Amino acid sequence: LKPDFTPDYDLIAQKAPGAKVCHIQRSRGYTQRNAFDLATIQKVADTARKANPNAVIFVDNCYGEFTQTAEPVAFGADIMAGSFIKNPGGGIAPTGGYIVGRKDLVELCAYRLNAPGLGKELGCTLETPRDMYLGFYYAPGVVCEAIKTAIYAQCMLELLGKKPIPRYCEAHNDIVTCFDAGTAEALIGFCQGIQAASPVDSYAAPEPSPEPGYTDEVIMASGSFTQGSTIELSCDGPLREPYTCYLQGGLNFAASRAGVLLAVQNAYFKD
């Protein structure tokens, strides 16, 4: 990516020859950028494929499912994957993930997961298919609630002088909102407010702590029915300047709105 977090198409074309996979992460991770829209994914795929027709275009679609009326496999991706404890599980699926795309590539993934030649015909399901299918059925509506929550939070944060990404009036290509909390105390207070408004473990007060894979301490708030679920209202952020907070999820707008209000109050109006 360029310093402004847009794809460097010249560098992509330079690096593509000889590469087996072009990996596109749709959502932002711990960076301050918008999620890639479908047109950008298409352009990255076209650039890589022109430089290397044999490259597999893979999209990590986490947080992006059902935010638009189409998915990356319709915009240049050969294969994509995501998690059922995020958007496509609808807050109901307790575990799992999905892989979708070209049949030959999906079969190769199944062979690697289970056994060559047996693929998806083998393997345990942990008695979860019903919940997975039910969650997937509800997922588009749940994602709509999460986006409504994001837009509400973005409006609220702008009234406080913050600069959320994305803005309420911009296209939403994932369910995440990030903004600079300004201070460590505000970041911690916001996360603790989200936790206090959660339906599970609302009595807990999250604190920053070291996390494997991160260079800074991280604070995470998630009072969710499913451990690790981020389609449920949650937020987190690394304890480093400018103390960026990442807010996502919301199974229903009514409860999530209360969570946003409590988080803002706890971060900026404690006195």
Cite the ranges covered by each PLM segment:
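Conserved C-terminal alpha-helix-loop-beta "cap" of PLP-dependent enzymes
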Residues: 158-270
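Conserved PLP-enzyme active-site core in the AAT-like
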Residues: 1-137, 143-144, 148, 157, ...
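Generic alpha-helical structural element
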Residues: 98, 142, 179-183
